[in-house]
Protein backbone atom coordinates (compact mmCIF):
# COMPACT_ATOMS: atom_id res chain seq x y z
CA UNK A 1 0.00 0.00 0.00
CA UNK A 2 2.69 2.54 0.96
CA UNK A 3 5.01 1.59 -1.89
CA UNK A 4 2.15 2.07 -4.36
CA UNK A 5 1.87 5.64 -3.07
CA UNK A 6 5.51 6.38 -3.94
CA UNK A 7 7.01 5.66 -0.53
CA UNK A 8 10.36 3.88 -0.54
CA UNK A 9 11.75 1.63 2.19
CA UNK A 10 14.63 3.58 3.72
CA UNK A 11 15.79 1.00 6.24
CA UNK A 12 15.28 -2.44 7.73
CA UNK A 13 12.92 -2.95 10.65
CA UNK A 14 15.20 -2.73 13.71
CA UNK A 15 18.26 -1.08 15.20
CA UNK A 16 20.03 -0.92 18.55
CA UNK A 17 17.71 1.89 19.54
CA UNK A 18 14.64 -0.29 19.32
CA UNK A 19 12.21 -1.66 16.80
CA UNK A 20 10.31 0.24 14.12
CA UNK A 21 8.16 -1.79 11.74
CA UNK A 22 9.01 0.33 8.69
CA UNK A 23 11.10 3.37 7.93
CA UNK A 24 9.92 4.84 4.64
CA UNK A 25 11.01 7.89 2.67
CA UNK A 26 8.57 10.13 0.82
CA UNK A 27 9.56 11.71 -2.48
CA UNK A 28 10.12 15.03 -0.71
CA UNK A 29 12.69 13.37 1.58
CA UNK A 30 10.54 13.13 4.71
CA UNK A 31 11.32 10.04 6.77
CA UNK A 32 8.19 8.23 7.89
CA UNK A 33 8.43 5.87 10.86
CA UNK A 34 5.54 3.43 10.45
CA UNK A 35 4.02 1.24 13.15
CA UNK A 36 1.84 -1.55 11.75
CA UNK A 37 -0.83 -2.96 14.08
CA UNK A 38 -3.20 -5.85 13.35
CA UNK A 39 -6.30 -7.15 15.06
CA UNK A 40 -8.77 -9.72 13.79
CA UNK A 41 -11.59 -7.22 14.33
CA UNK A 42 -12.19 -3.77 15.81
CA UNK A 43 -13.56 -4.88 19.18
CA UNK A 44 -11.88 -3.30 22.21
CA UNK A 45 -10.90 -0.17 20.25
CA UNK A 46 -9.25 -1.80 17.27
CA UNK A 47 -5.66 -1.93 16.11
CA UNK A 48 -4.95 1.81 16.23
CA UNK A 49 -5.95 1.94 19.90
CA UNK A 50 -3.10 -0.44 20.76
CA UNK A 51 -0.50 2.24 20.05
CA UNK A 52 -0.53 3.68 23.55
CA UNK A 53 1.82 6.12 25.26
CA UNK A 54 4.42 3.46 26.16
CA UNK A 55 4.57 2.22 22.55
CA UNK A 56 4.82 5.80 21.26
CA UNK A 57 7.74 6.47 23.63
CA UNK A 58 9.56 3.36 22.39
CA UNK A 59 9.01 4.37 18.75
CA UNK A 60 10.23 7.91 19.43
CA UNK A 61 13.32 6.49 21.16
CA UNK A 62 14.06 4.19 18.20
CA UNK A 63 13.53 7.03 15.71
CA UNK A 64 15.82 9.34 17.70
CA UNK A 65 18.51 6.65 17.69
CA UNK A 66 18.11 6.23 13.93
CA UNK A 67 18.21 9.99 13.25
CA UNK A 68 21.41 10.47 15.29
CA UNK A 69 23.30 8.48 12.66
CA UNK A 70 22.44 10.99 9.94
CA UNK A 71 24.61 14.04 9.30
CA UNK A 72 21.55 16.17 8.50
CA UNK A 73 18.33 14.62 9.80
CA UNK A 74 15.42 15.20 7.40
CA UNK A 75 11.90 16.11 8.45
CA UNK A 76 10.11 13.09 9.86
CA UNK A 77 6.75 11.93 11.13
CA UNK A 78 5.11 8.91 12.76
CA UNK A 79 2.35 7.03 10.93
CA UNK A 80 0.28 4.05 12.02
CA UNK A 81 -1.15 1.47 9.64
CA UNK A 82 -4.02 -0.20 11.49
CA UNK A 83 -5.45 -3.44 10.16
CA UNK A 84 -8.76 -4.55 11.67
CA UNK A 85 -9.86 -7.73 9.92
CA UNK A 86 -10.17 -6.77 6.25
CA UNK A 87 -10.15 -3.01 6.92
CA UNK A 88 -6.85 -1.14 6.52
CA UNK A 89 -6.50 2.42 7.80
CA UNK A 90 -3.39 4.54 7.28
CA UNK A 91 -3.12 7.22 9.96
CA UNK A 92 -0.66 9.82 8.68
CA UNK A 93 1.04 11.86 11.41
CA UNK A 94 -0.70 9.71 14.03
CA UNK A 95 1.46 11.27 16.76
CA UNK A 96 4.60 13.35 17.10
CA UNK A 97 7.66 13.38 19.33
CA UNK A 98 5.96 15.86 21.66
CA UNK A 99 3.24 13.33 22.59
Question: Model-derived features: where do they sit?
Answer:
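Conserved beta-strand positions that form and line the central face of beta-propeller blades
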Residues: 2, 50, 90
